[in-house]
Structure formats: C-alpha cells, structure tokens
Amino acid sequence: NEINTILKSQTIERIYYYIKRLKKSILEVKTNGINDINLNNWKEYDDIITDSLWILHKRDNSGSHNAKYWGNFIPQIPNQFLRRYTKQNEWVLDPFLGSGTTLIECKRLGRNGIGIELQSEVVELAKTNISLETNIFNVRTEIINADSTKLNFKDELKKLNISSVQFLILHPPYWDIIKFSENPNDLSNAKSITDFLILLGNVIDNT
C-alpha cells in the first residue's frame, strides 16, 4: 500500500514524505503501552477490525476451536479484544470459561490465561480443547472448577503465584436463553432478570 502511494505521488515533496513514513514504519516501533500494536505501522494490521460494527462472515474453526458446546464465544471476539487491550505474557481472566475459547486464544497470542468454570464436566471439555492447541509461546493456562459468584479471586491468584491480571473478559449466559445446567448457582437458572443481574454483579465485584 505504501509503495503504491509513493508511485502515485505527483511531487518530489510528497514522494519524500511517503518514503520517510515508510522507513519509519519499518525501522521504528511505537506502542501505546496497552498492547503490542506498532502505531507506526498500524495500516498493516488489516485483520484488526477498526469499525464499530464487527461483521464476521464465519466463525473461526481452526486448530482446537469448535462449536460443539452451545453458547460459546465466537473466537474472533476474544482475539480482537486480547490484541487490542493486552500485551504478550500478560494475564487474562475469564470467569465464564465454558469450553475454553478465551484460553485457546491466549495460547495463540502469547497471553497467560485463567479460566473459571462452574460445571466439572465442562471443565474437562475445556482442558481437552485447550490442550490440543499448540503452546508456541510457552504461556500458562490455569483452569479452576468453581463458582465465580462466590470465589475469592485474590486468594486463587495468590495460590497460583500470580500478583495481578491485566484483562478481564466475560461472556456470561444470556439469562435463560440457554439452560446450561441444573445447578442453582448457574446464572442461566436465575429466577428473574433481577436475580440474574445480582449474580452477575457478584462476579464483577469478586473480580
């Protein structure tokens, strides 16, 4: 793109300007401290969606991603968030882990991840899915079978020798649209929208 811009320039001044900009994008790295995106080369990140409306034509089913567990994240969503708001080797916490989509993306992008899941059988599914993803960045993925509405997150982080997490991502049940279990502590079993919001608020307060 930059080369084409240079070739289409009609004055020496503009050619010089675009060459200087291209050189800067190649040789200098400028970040904002929040993520690893090189702001001098931001045009090259064509896979990062910059529009306010995200149109995803197809969910990512590559690697260990699959849609077998109902209501799970479309992988592109945590991928976009992690790349925008975290850096490599930082910690990400998902209090509604489900089948493990967030932690799979953590492994792909070089982020450490902690996932909390209420149902023991879903924990085993998540462990399987996450283990199938190659750990090319040698990051940690920790899975805890617990109730996020009651869990003392500070104590759990201390047990894992983690001082803090840099990003919290939540994909809770949409109240009663999908019933995930018979567990009364499951947010999808809340008796009313008010009860659901109270339980969700407890998770947010705990984290």
What positions do the PLM features span?
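Class I S-adenosyl-L-methionine-dependent methyltransferase catalytic core
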Residues: 1-207
